[in-house]
Amino acid sequence: MIPNEINYIYGLPAYITKLDPKLYEKNKILSQIEKNYKLSKARNKWAGDSFFKTEVHYLPEDKKNPKLKKINYYSLPQQYEKIITNFLHKLAPQKNFTSTNVIVNCTCIRHNSVMLPHIHTGCTFSLVHYLSFDKKQHLPTIFKSPYY
């Protein structure tokens, strides 16, 4: 994929870019995620009967757990808004768009587990942001064809 340009995967627009860690509190956010992870490394079995190990540290399950600290993402939405606006402008330069974005998930995986393919229902599009990614340890996001 070509960074900062519209690319097409299965006929659907995709956009890859880098977010400068100096523009948001990357280390603080990552530290909060890692502290929660250390308290409970694999408490969510993401898929029931799966050939793959799917034990992950998954944000939506954190909300009701008093032991885990709420992660403060306040520095990210403004940066996401810039990226989303740029993406939409590249799709249709003549149009003015308004959008809202919500951080609905944070997943921490460090122990040879995977998040299985899934669909984000109710979303016009999704954004994946890797705060920390080691090519030797992690599998990248894989896009499956929506046609089969």
Describe the function of each predicted region:
Residues 11-13, 100-102, 123-125:
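Residues at beta-strand starts and edge strands
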Residues 93-104:
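A short coil-to-beta-strand element that immediately follows conserved catalytic motifs
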Residues 105-148:
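Catalytic core of non-heme Fe(II) oxygenases with the double-stranded beta-helix
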Residues 1-94, 114, 140:
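Non-heme Fe(II)/2-oxoglutarate
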Residues 70, 74, 78, 98-100, ...:
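Alpha-helix initiation and capping sites
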